[in-house]
């Protein structure tokens, strides 16, 4: 009889996307709260922490803080040692694939190999428009996602990518 795999538990780190910091006016205090959740999750034995790849709040933009996911994970990686780090889920429309390959590989190195990379085609049109990113039709976004995954995987594993 083989044992069932143990459940894996993760927790979201507050970063403002869902207005988790409403009522906390100081961004430095908001950051301390985010880091405290990550450190506490590791101390409690969670397997992973997760952040959203968004730039402003939902359901519509507000003036509340939202911490950018890659910067957030890089900083938290230096305050933790074992917990895995992931995005739920990275948006392909926000960063060119070659840059994304560099960001992800850098974070994986500085975190000691703890990155769990997730990427999607993008869905939040208001956010894309608000930051000046094109928002193609779904078929085109899916094709762009496929190409991006191929580029990132090649840049991670091949001596040269063309």
Where are each of the predicted segments found?
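Structural motif
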Residues: 52, 88, 118-120
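N-terminal beta1-alpha1-beta2 module of alpha/beta enzyme domains
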Residues: 1-79
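Hydrophobic residues within beta-strands of alpha/beta enzymes
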Residues: 49, 85, 115-117
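Alpha-helix-loop-beta-strand connector modules within alpha/beta enzyme cores
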Residues: 62-87, 144-155
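Alpha-helix termination/capping residues and helix-transition junctions
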Residues: 43, 82, 109-112
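Flexible, glycine-rich active-site loops centered on histidine and acidic residues
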Residues: 7-29, 92-162
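A general structural signal for well-ordered secondary-structure junctions
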Residues: 47, 82-83, 161
């Amino acid at each position: 009889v083989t044992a069932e795999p143990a459940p894996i538990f993760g927790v979201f780190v507050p970063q403002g996307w869902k207005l988790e910091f409403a009522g906390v006016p100081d961004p430095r205090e908001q950051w301390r709260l985010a880091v405290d959740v990550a450190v506490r999750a590791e101390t409690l034995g969670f397997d992973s922490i997760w952040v959203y790849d968004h730039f402003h709040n939902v359901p519509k933009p507000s003036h509340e803080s939202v911490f950018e996911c890659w910067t957030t994970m890089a900083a938290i990686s230096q305050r933790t040692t074992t917990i895995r780090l992931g995005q739920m889920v990275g948006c392909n429309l926000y960063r060119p694939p070659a840059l994304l390959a560099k960001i992800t590989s850098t974070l994986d190195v500085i975190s000691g190999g703890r990155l769990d990379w997730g990427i999607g085609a993008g869905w939040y049109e208001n956010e894309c428009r608000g930051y000046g990113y094109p928002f193609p039709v779904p078929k085109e976004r899916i094709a762009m996602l496929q190409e991006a995954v191929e580029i990132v995987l090649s840049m991670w594993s091949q001596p040269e990518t063309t």
